[in-house]
Design a protein with these regions (language model features):
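Conserved catalytic core of the tyrosine transesterase superfamily
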Residues: 1-116
Length: 116
C-alpha cells in the first residue's frame, strides 16, 4: 500500500507563468492575418483553458450572448456542451482576426481556419 504524497497535488502538465503567457501573446505579428489568427488562438487557450480538440471544434456561431454576457459555446469531451464567459482580451483578438479574415458571416464555418 502506497501512502499519498505530501507534495503539491498538481497535474502532469505544468502551468505557464504570467511572464511566459505575456511573451506568447506578444509573439505573433499583429499586422498579418496569420499573426492575428495565432494571437486569437493563443488568447482563447490562455484565457479559457480549452483543450486542443475543443478549440478546433469552435464555429463562428459558437460566439453567443447569454443574458447580456458573451460566451463561447464549447463542445467538450463526451459530447457535453458548456458555455464559457468570453474574456474581453480574447474576444478583441478574435474580433480583430475575423475582421481581417472576412469570414464572420460564415456562421457554420470553423472559427479558426488554416491559411493558404
Amino acid at each position: 500500500v502506497k501512502r499519498p504524497s505530501e507534495g503539491i497535488n498538481e497535474g502532469k502538465t505544468p502551468a505557464i507563468g504570467d511572464a511566459e503567457a505575456r511573451r506568447l501573446l506578444a509573439a505573433p505579428n499583429p499586422e498579418t492575418l496569420k499573426g492575428k489568427r495565432d494571437k486569437a488562438i493563443l488568447s482563447t487557450f490562455l484565457f479559457h483553458g480549452l483543450r486542443c480538440e475543443e478549440l478546433c471544434q469552435l464555429r463562428v456561431k459558437d460566439i453567443t450572448s447569454r443574458r447580456g454576457v458573451i460566451h463561447l459555446r464549447v463542445h467538450g469531451k463526451g459530447s457535453k456542451i458548456r458555455f464559457v464567459p468570453a474574456h474581453p482580451t480574447a474576444l478583441e483578438a478574435i474580433s480583430d482576426y475575423l475582421d481581417m479574415a472576412g469570414h464572420r458571416d460564415d456562421v457554420n464555418g470553423a472559427l479558426f481556419r488554416p491559411l493558404k
